[in-house]
């Protein structure tokens, strides 16, 4: 449960309170009962109860004597009919406290209700009991009763606290979640938001940080209210909440939720920035998260940083449990699959870091199931004037098969042979490419054939001139 039981308020001596005090949170007067005092015999026993609860051991650590407390309270219980109503209310308060310590919530609930039934119970005892009953009820899943008690508490308390509003908001949220009829669900979610906003407002006025859970509940409510307020309004309201959460409580899930909302609203730049913030804070720990950031960086003309993100994911290791052996191993977040390696190599290539792209593409080619990766590798080699390597890679790709466009690969292969002045082999590759049905490829191949023939003649002529000059000498 997101609601936890708070410390309990209890009274054991004289209570002096003004007869009427203005309520700060409502346009009403809160009337207090006259100040009351315990009977002497009851007061003595209550003093012993307090002493037992405040007992410390020889090291000064708290060591409550609950056994003595229970004995004294049982003695008071046996004399219950002879006690005054106020005395019984104090007794029930201590019984409730004891049951809470024992985590016997049904008994604590019963004790608080008996306290409220006492006609002479004072306002401080009543409001503390009502608040505790609201907490107990909600902790036990009885949200309807919990809401009833917190509303009653609000009627009787002088000042409604932020915690009170948040408790009510939590109750409304759970009631909404439990309802089957959509209109009832949405009504409760709206009430939950209103209550949580009141809690946040009070916390801000009193200059302390609102609780994380208050915002979480509001975000969940706004998400559920899509049928009533529309998808865009729902997303914008959630956006406001998550923008607060990432600043106050910078957790991974809040960054991802915020990024997801930006993405749904087509705010790609904000989506990228938010994911990058999570990355910079080292919050990302899943392959999909690293790849999503790299992809959006790449699509926004940041190939260098896309590559850096993927590299970081390859280096970062997280514990993974083997399903068969149940052994925990430290494995890289981003795995060296063919797809991931090609993504990384392409990013380095687009960043003009060909020297970094080549070893990655070499690794991708070794694990590839088809020849296409070798073709890409060959193109990278060619761009770096590694002609022999380019020829070898492209030939391996063509031999392996399943190449996307064999004719284009032949063109690239022919260009590599051309640069090595292997003119006959170059023309052979260009002629194969020229058989393609694609007009552009056919035209390019034929142009290369003519260019190669001309270059071959030029080179031969240069060689003849060189030989002639040497012979003349």
Predicted regions: what is each one?
Residues 97-107, 135-148, 172-189, 219-238, ...:
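Alpha-helical linker/edge segments of TPR/alpha-solenoid repeat scaffolds
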Residues 31-37, 77-84, 116-123, 152-159, ...:
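Solenoid-like repeat scaffolds
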Residues 38-48, 84-92, 122-132, 157-167, ...:
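Generic helix N-cap/helix-start motif at coil->alpha-helix transitions
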Residues 338-405:
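Alpha-helical adaptor scaffolds
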Residues 10, 18-113, 121-132, 139, ...:
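N-terminal leader/linker segments that initiate helical-solenoid repeat arrays
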Residues 49-52, 56, 96, 134, ...:
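Conserved small-residue packing positions in alpha-helical repeats and bundles
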Residues 186-201, 247-248, 263, 280, ...:
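TPR/TPR-like (Sel1-like) alpha-helical repeat modules
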């Amino acid at each position: 449960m997101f609601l936890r039981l708070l410390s309990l308020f209890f009274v054991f001596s004289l209570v002096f309170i003004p007869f009427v005090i203005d309520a700060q949170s409502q346009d009403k007067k809160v009337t207090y009962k006259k100040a009351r005092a315990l009977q002497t015999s009851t007061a003595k026993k209550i003093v012993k109860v307090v002493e037992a609860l405040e007992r410390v051991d020889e090291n000064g650590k708290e060591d409550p004597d609950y056994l003595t407390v229970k004995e004294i309270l049982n003695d008071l219980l046996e004399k219950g009919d002879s006690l005054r109503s106020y005395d019984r209310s104090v007794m029930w308060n201590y019984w409730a406290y004891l049951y809470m310590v024992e985590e016997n919530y049904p008994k604590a609930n019963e004790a608080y209700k008996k306290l409220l039934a006492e006609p002479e119970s004072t306002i401080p005892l009543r409001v503390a009991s009502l608040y505790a009953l609201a907490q107990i009820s909600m902790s036990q899943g009885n949200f309807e009763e919990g809401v009833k008690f917190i509303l009653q508490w609000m009627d009787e308390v002088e000042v409604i606290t932020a915690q009170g509003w948040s408790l009510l908001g939590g109750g409304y949220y759970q009631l909404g979640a439990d309802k089957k009829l959509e209109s009832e669900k949405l009504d409760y979610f709206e009430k939950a938001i209103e209550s949580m906003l009141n809690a946040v407002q009070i916390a801000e006025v009193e200059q302390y940080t609102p609780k994380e859970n208050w915002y979480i509940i509001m975000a969940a409510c706004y998400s559920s209210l899509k049928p009533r307020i529309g998808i865009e309004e729902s997303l914008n309201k959630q956006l406001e909440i998550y923008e607060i959460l990432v600043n106050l409580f910078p957790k991974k899930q809040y960054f991802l939720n915020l990024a997801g909302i930006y993405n749904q609203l087509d705010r790609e730049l904000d989506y990228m920035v938010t994911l990058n913030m999570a990355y910079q804070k080292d919050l990302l720990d899943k392959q999909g998260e690293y790849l999503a950031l790299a992809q959006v960086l790449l699509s926004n003309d940041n190939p260098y940083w896309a590559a850096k993100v993927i590299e970081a994911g390859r280096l970062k290791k997280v514990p993974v449990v083997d399903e068969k052996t149940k052994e925990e191993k430290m494995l890289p977040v981003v795995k060296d699959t063919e797809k991931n390696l090609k993504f990384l190599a392409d990013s380095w290539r687009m960043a003009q870091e060909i020297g970094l792209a080549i070893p990655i593409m070499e690794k991708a080619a070794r694990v590839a199931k088809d020849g296409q990766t070798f073709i890409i590798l060959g193109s990278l080699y060619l761009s770096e004037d590694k002609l022999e390597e380019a020829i070898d890679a492209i030939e391996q790709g063509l031999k392996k098969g399943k190449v996307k466009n064999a004719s284009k690969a032949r063109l690239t292969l022919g260009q590599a042979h051309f640069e090595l002045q292997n003119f006959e082999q170059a023309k052979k590759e260009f002629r194969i490419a020229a058989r393609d049905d694609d007009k552009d490829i056919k035209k390019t191949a034929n142009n290369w054939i003519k260019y190669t023939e001309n270059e071959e003649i030029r080179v031969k002529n240069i060689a003849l001139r060189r030989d002639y000059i040497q012979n003349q000498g």
